[in-house]
Amino acid sequence: MYNSNITDITTLLPHRYPFLLIDRIIAYQKNFNILTIKNISYSEFCFTGHFYKNPVFPGVLILEAIAQSACLLVYKSFGMSYKNNLFYLTNIIDVKFKKKVIPGDQMLINVFVDKHHHRLIRFVGHVSVSKYIVCKATISCLLTNDVVSR
């Protein structure tokens, strides 16, 4: 089991409030997978207009949480950070939203490396709330500098 704090995360990721969507890393296996948490609070910036009297965490932000988790996995696996290698989302496929995410929920984000070839890496992400999958997606990301294929 692995446990991190927000300082560990902000050392690796360039994202800051309101777009830092990872609160904690709870498990990590080098070059394989990462498990992260995002706590959903009513004070999230998106709830002022999404939707009035019926707040729903936007699906695009769930996908961004998957991408940020993937970024953390790569940065930790290769001893990098945003300071020496940026990570760009290039593709999103096979997205399925199964349930809505609302204030008070805790998203558990599980991301696995699917394929890795030099700078291009494909991931599969599953997001769950209370043991129910709320989103599945396959994403691809590109590093600005080459890394050795595993």
Curated annotation (Swiss-Prot):
InterPro entries: FabA_FabZ, FabZ, HotDog_dom_sf. Transmembrane segments: none annotated. NCBIfam families: PRK00006.1. Involved in unsaturated fatty acids biosynthesis. Catalyzes the dehydration of short chain beta-hydroxyacyl-ACPs and long chain saturated and unsaturated beta-hydroxyacyl-ACPs. One of its GO terms (molecular function) is (3R)-hydroxyacyl-[acyl-carrier-protein] dehydratase activity. Pfam families: FabA. Belongs to the thioester dehydratase family. FabZ subfamily. Signal peptide: none annotated. The keyword Lipid biosynthesis applies. Its EC number is 4.2.1.59. The gene is fabZ. It comes from the Bacteria. One of its GO terms (biological process) is fatty acid biosynthetic process. It catalyses: a (3R)-hydroxyacyl-[ACP] = a (2E)-enoyl-[ACP] + H2O. This is 3-hydroxyacyl-[acyl-carrier-protein] dehydratase FabZ. Keywords: Cytoplasm, Lipid A biosynthesis, Lipid biosynthesis, Lipid metabolism, Lyase. The active site is at H50. The keyword Cell membrane does not apply. It is found in: Cytoplasm. GO terms for cellular component: cytoplasm; membrane.
